[in-house]
Amino acid sequence: MTRCDVLVVGGTHGNEINGAWLVDQWRDQHDLLDAAGLSLALEIGNPEARTANRRYVDRDLNRCFTADLLNQGGQEQELQRARQLLAWHGPDGATPCRVALDLHSTTAAMGSCLVVYGRRPADLALAARVQGALGLPIYLHEADAAQTGFLVEQWPCGLVIEVGPVPQGVLDALVVRQTRIALETCCQELAAARAGTGRDPHNLVVHRHLGSVDLPRDQRDCAAAMVHPQLQGQDWRPLMDGAAMFELPRGGTVPLQADEGETWPLFINEAAYAEKRIAFSLTRREVWPIDPSWGQALEQLMG
């Protein structure tokens, strides 16, 4: 069995074209990407949706990777693609990969950041070391039963690289550059883990998911307010209870009443989340000490 170090996926969402464009370029010109000596498998996540310039054809591919969905025999296009990616590069696939890196973009003002799902030690080690190298903020998404089935969770280690803002379907040179830098840094840290030369930062700063907030709804179940101008574009900035959250049609304000103290909103007004009834997500900023077992798990995986 031939093994591969890293699965790199672009275009998991078909209208997020920057990561997919990079995958195309790297396939044609291998020297454009410094993989730090690692072997890569490069895949377009959802080719059919990319051709149609849509997020997905039948359902969100990045919510398809749950055991129930994968095993129930559904024939929706994205379920078939999820099974195919696992058959090719999953832990038990024809060419299994140790790590999955999923390239995404967002219409929200998230900058360049990492998304981690749950608290797997190898994930935390890689995220911490990339944060130490680049200073990227980290969104820790966990404990949300409404949002599950993410691609990278099916691999022993995996992160999402998220860059924005950029409109859907728009190729943006800065987004491409930031995505490449983050990916190359991930590869460098994985190679260092293999060599036993990886260095942990003093701590890990995460923004831990608390929950998501929908727009107010009217009797027709339609949006009855908008994200407030004072909140728009303020991703990664603290928000206190009572702060302006939504603006009503006549100019009134709906304040935040989360009873959570200081929270940090993310993915504010992300276009793709309107169908999921998410105007933004609330997080809490936390600083964690580095657990040596994280790095040990990553080194064992890459050894």
Curated annotation (Swiss-Prot):
It catalyses: an N-acyl-L-aspartate + H2O = a carboxylate + L-aspartate. Substrate binds at R55, N62, R63, E162, Y273. Zn(2+) binds at H13, E16, H104. Pfam families: AstE_AspA_cat (PF24827), AstE_AspA_hybrid (PF04952). It comes from the Bacteria. GO terms for cellular component: cytosol. Binds 1 zinc ion per subunit. SUPFAM superfamilies: Zn-dependent exopeptidases (SSF53187). Its cofactor is Zn(2+). Keywords: Hydrolase, Metal-binding, Zinc. It is an enzyme of class 3 (hydrolase). GO terms for molecular function: aspartoacylase activity; hydrolase activity, acting on ester bonds; zinc ion binding. Its EC number is 3.5.1.15. Belongs to the AspA/AstE family. Aspartoacylase subfamily. NCBIfam families: PRK02259.1. PANTHER family: ASPARTOACYLASE, SUCCINYLGLUTAMATE DESUCCINYLASE. This is Probable aspartoacylase.
